[in-house]
C-alpha cells in the first residue's frame, strides 16, 4: 500500500507522517517513508539526524544509477521504519519536483517498492505542480493534514482538486483529513459539510508534539521514557488502523476557489456577529 501525505507548508506533515509510519510499524508492517522536500527533514524524528539525500548520493556517484545500491540511499529509523530523502537542487536553481520523480525512478530500479508493506510519501507543502504531484501517480490513498484555519483548508481544497484529477487515470482515493493542532474544529466541519471528506483524526494542540520535532524523536520513542504520552500515540495508531482497514476512500469534488473564500469568510463573519450579539445581551 502506498500513501501520499500532503498539506499546507508548516502544518506538521512531517511530524504527523513519522508518527503514522511508526504506528504502522507497530502494527507489524514493513514501512518505508520517503521525504519529498528539498529541506530533506521529513525523516528527522525517525533517524534523529538529517540523512544524506538521493541527490547527494547521485552526485557522489557522478549520476551513475547503476552504481547505487539500496543501502546507499535507505537508512534505518526508529521502530524499523526505513527512510529515504529525495533532497533537491540548490536554492534558486533547478526543479524540486523533478528530483521527486527521479527518486521514485531510482527506487523502482532498485526494486525497493516491492520490499515494503507500506510506502509513505511525505510531500512538500501545498505545491501540486506536476513534479510534486507525482507521488499521487503511485499512491493508493492521499491523506491531507490541515488545521482549523482558512489558509490550511484552502490548501486542502487545492490538494483535493489534484486528487480528483489524478483519479481519472490512477487507482487513487482520498482517505481523509487529519486535523492537526486543532483546539477547535468548527471550520473543518464547515468545509467537510460542503466537500464531503472523511475526518480520520483530530489531533489537539499538544506541546509535546511540537517538542518531539525539536528533540528529533517520534511521540512513540518519547513515550518509552514518559508513559504519560501513550494516549497521544493512540491518535496515530487510530489513523494507522483506519488505513490498514483499506477504507473505500473518495474522489473529492472540491469547491471553486472563489466559493471557498465566500464560504469560509461568511462563516467567520457570522461567528463574529454572533459573538458581538452575545456580548451586547450580556
Curated annotation (Swiss-Prot):
Enzymatic class: oxidoreductase
UniProt keyword annotations, A-Z: 4Fe-4S, ATP-binding, Bacteriochlorophyll biosynthesis, Chlorophyll biosynthesis, Cyanelle, Iron, Iron-sulfur, Magnesium, Metal-binding, Nucleotide-binding, Oxidoreductase, Photosynthesis, Plastid
General function of this protein: Component of the dark-operative protochlorophyllide reductase (DPOR) that uses Mg-ATP and reduced ferredoxin to reduce ring D of protochlorophyllide (Pchlide) to form chlorophyllide a (Chlide). This reaction is light-independent. The L component serves as a unique electron donor to the NB-component of the complex, and binds Mg-ATP.
Assembly with partners or alone: Homodimer. Protochlorophyllide reductase is composed of three subunits; ChlL, ChlN and ChlB.
Pathway: Porphyrin-containing compound metabolism; chlorophyll biosynthesis (light-independent)
Superkingdom assignment: Eukaryota
Cofactor: [4Fe-4S] cluster
Localization of this protein: Plastid, Cyanelle
Family: Belongs to the NifH/BchL/ChlL family.
Entry keyword Iron-sulfur: yes
Catalytic activities: chlorophyllide a + oxidized 2[4Fe-4S]-[ferredoxin] + 2 ADP + 2 phosphate = protochlorophyllide a + reduced 2[4Fe-4S]-[ferredoxin] + 2 ATP + 2 H2O
InterPro entries to which the protein is assigned, alphabetical: NifH/chlL_CS (IPR030655), NifH/frxC (IPR000392), P-loop_NTPase (IPR027417), Protochlorophyllide_ATP-bd (IPR005971)
Chain positions recorded as [4Fe-4S] cluster binding sites: 95, 129
Record-listed Mg(2+) binding positions: 14
Chain coiled-coil ranges: none
Principal location: plastid
GO molecular-function terms, A-Z: 4 iron, 4 sulfur cluster binding; ATP binding; metal ion binding; oxidoreductase activity, acting on iron-sulfur proteins as donors; oxidoreductase activity, acting on the CH-CH group of donors, iron-sulfur protein as acceptor
Cellular component GO terms, alphabetical: cyanelle
One annotated GO biological process: photosynthesis, dark reaction
Pfam families cross-referenced by the UniProt entry: Fer4_NifH (PF00142)
Protein name according to UniProt: Light-independent protochlorophyllide reductase iron-sulfur ATP-binding protein
Chain residues that bind ATP: 10-15, 39, 180-181
E.C. number(s) listed in UniProt: 1.3.7.7
Entry note: cofactor: Binds 1 [4Fe-4S] cluster per dimer.
Amino acid at each position: 500500500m502506498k500513501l501520499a501525505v500532503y498539506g499546507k507548508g508548516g502544518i506538521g506533515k512531517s511530524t504527523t507522517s513519522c508518527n503514522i509510519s511508526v504506528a504502522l510499524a507497530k502494527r507489524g508492517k514493513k514501512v518505508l517513508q520517503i521525504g519529498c522536500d528539498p529541506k530533506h527533514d521529513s525523516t528527522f524524528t525517525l533517524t534523529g539526524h538529517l540523512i544524506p539525500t538521493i541527490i547527494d548520493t547521485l552526485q557522489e556517484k557522478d549520476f551513475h544509477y547503476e552504481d547505487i545500491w539500496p543501502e546507499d540511499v535507505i537508512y534505518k529509523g526508529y521502530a524499523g521504519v526505513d527512510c529515504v530523502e529525495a533532497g533537491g537542487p540548490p536554492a534558486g536553481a533547478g526543479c524540486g519536483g523533478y528530483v521527486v520523480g527521479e527518486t521514485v525512478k531510482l527506487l523502482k530500479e532498485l526494486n525497493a517498492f516491492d520490499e515494503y508493506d507500506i510506502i509513505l510519501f511525505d510531500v512538500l507543502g501545498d505545491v501540486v505542480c506536476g513534479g510534486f504531484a507525482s507521488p499521487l501517480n503511485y499512491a493508493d490513498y492521499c491523506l491531507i493534514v490541515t488545521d482549523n484555519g482558512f489558509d490550511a483548508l484552502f490548501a486542502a481544497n487545492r490538494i483535493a482538486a489534484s486528487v480528483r484529477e489524478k483519479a481519472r487515470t490512477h487507482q487513487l482515493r482520498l482517505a481523509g483529513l487529519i486535523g492537526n493542532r486543532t483546539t477547535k474544529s468548527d471550520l473543518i466541519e464547515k468545509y467537510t459539510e460542503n466537500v464531503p471528506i472523511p475526518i480520520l483524526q483530530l489531533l489537539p494542540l499538544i506541546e509535546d508534539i511540537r517538542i518531539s520535532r525539536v528533540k528529533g524523536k517520534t511521540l512513540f520513542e518519547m513515550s518509552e521514557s514518559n508513559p504519560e504520552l501513550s494516549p497521544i500515540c493512540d491518535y496515530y495508531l487510530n489513523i494507522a488502523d483506519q488505513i490498514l482497514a483499506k477504507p473505500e476512500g473518495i474522489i473529492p469534488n472540491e469547491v471553486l476557489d472563489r466559493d471557498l473564500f465566500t464560504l469560509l469568510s461568511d462563516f467567520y463573519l457570522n461567528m463574529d456577529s454572533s459573538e458581538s450579539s452575545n456580548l451586547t445581551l450580556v
